[in-house]
Amino acid sequence: MGFPRLWAALLRAWGRWTARPGPRVPGLPPMAGNKVPPALPSHQPDRKGRGGWVWEETEHPAKRVKGGEDEEPPRKLPKRKIVLLMAYSGKGYHGMQRNLGSSQFRTIEDDLVSALVQAGCIPENHGTDMRKMSFQRCARTDKGVSAAGQVVSLKVWLIDDILDKINSHLPSHIRILGLKRVTGGFNSKNKCDARTYCYMLPTFAFAHKDRDVQDESYRLSAETLQQVNRLLGCYKGTHNFHNFTSQKGPREPSARRYILEMYCEEPFVREGLEFAVIKVKGQSFMMHQIRKMVGLVVAIVKGYAPESVLERSWGEEKVDVPKAPGLGLVLERVHFEKYNQRFGSDGLHEPLDWAQEEGKVTAFKEQYIYPTIVSTERDERSMAQWLNTLPIHNFSGTALGADDTGAKVPSSLEGSEGDGDTD
């Protein structure tokens, strides 16, 4: 076909196509017959990027988020799993653990969660449902019990100056002393290998009953301190502690607990009264266990109970074991040795040893925990009152209802449930 004939064919085709009725829309096929074409949109689309047409936003204005035209959308910070090192004086609190729906009983976690929300670390709804931030504490310290090294794990937004902002919303007797990143599945209670508690008491508790002294003049002798440490050392190892709690029977496997160490430190004087601190480290403790361990040693040293009662208390028979007052019990620190061995040197996570925070821990104890124990002991004399109940106990035979034998001493700091990190 020559060029003239090809050109004529193209002109004829063009004439037939342009003669069809109705407006044409680029990109749409021509309309057949006299059908009315679809109406075009009343606005012109905005072309964005390469290819495709993006239509203008048609959402009703009332549904749009209010704000300036140039306002940027809110940032979404990723949540990170962390642990917080806490110290607190438990006076006036009903323990560590939060009890939702029971606002009349104020707990340490009530104040902590409120501070986390106000600081902008967690959303407000996480405060009412703590599972949303995977919250867990190492130990449930009880009513009036203090802590110098409590550790909690949770997910938060890692905002700038996070420790300062949290502490700014906490009372002075509750402090966050440290923060570390941990693995995503970390659970502070389950990953804790051991817990160390201390029990601070006036040394006149060890004065023999035949020359009992309950005033500021008593000073603990080196011989008596040696006897105390010999008896406390008997607790080391694995024993059946069913007589040291009201929760377990003699044949329950969970009544067997492993004690790594227990000893009494050198005495010191506060406000004219001599005190000593007993430290105990164990894998875990049952309700009232530490207070009963201290109570039985005091009863032996004072001459109310024979030393043989220790061996008997680990047998299946029921033994009358006195429970020392809750005042003086402090959660000293928690240990994560297996976690540190696995993750502490992997280059991604820090070991949970808190060595750098040791100075702050000591300062907090000296400023808030020890003064509270000393002043309360002087005002309420809880140890002196409890010592007067020791003659009531029967240490020679099988105990029946021994837990209720007039040994309860009321105190604003007495732990309602004892040592707190029960199963």
Swiss-Prot record:
Please state where this protein is localized.
Nucleus; Cytoplasm; Mitochondrion
| Keyword Cell inner membrane on entry | no
**What is one cellular component GO term in this UniProt entry?**
nucleoplasm
Q: Which residues carry this modification: Phosphoserine?
A: S411, S416
Catalytic reaction equation(s): a uridine in tRNA = a pseudouridine in tRNA; uridine(38/39/40) in tRNA = pseudouridine(38/39/40) in tRNA; a uridine in mRNA = a pseudouridine in mRNA
Please state the Enzyme Commission number of this protein: 5.4.99.-, 5.4.99.12
Q: Per the record, which residues fall in region Disordered?
A: 32-75, 401-423
- Name the enzyme group at the top EC level: isomerase
Q: Which residues are annotated as modified residue Phosphothreonine in the UniProt record?
A: T422
Q: Name one GO molecular function term.
A: chromatin binding
Q: Which Pfam families match?
A: PseudoU_synth_1
By sequence similarity, the record places it as follows:
Belongs to the tRNA pseudouridine synthase TruA family.
Q: What does this protein do?
A: Pseudouridylate synthase that catalyzes pseudouridylation of tRNAs and mRNAs. Acts on positions 27/28 in the anticodon stem and also positions 34 and 36 in the anticodon of an intron containing tRNA. Also catalyzes pseudouridylation of mRNAs: mediates pseudouridylation of mRNAs with the consensus sequence 5'-UGUAG-3'. Acts as a regulator of pre-mRNA splicing by mediating pseudouridylation of pre-mRNAs at locations associated with alternatively spliced regions. Pseudouridylation of pre-mRNAs near splice sites directly regulates mRNA splicing and mRNA 3'-end processing.
Subunit structure, interactors included: Monomer. Forms a complex with RARG and the SRA1 RNA in the nucleus.
User: Which protein are we looking at?
Assistant: Pseudouridylate synthase 1 homolog
Taxonomic lineage is: Eukaryota, Metazoa, Chordata, Craniata, Vertebrata
Q: Which gene encodes it?
A: Pus1
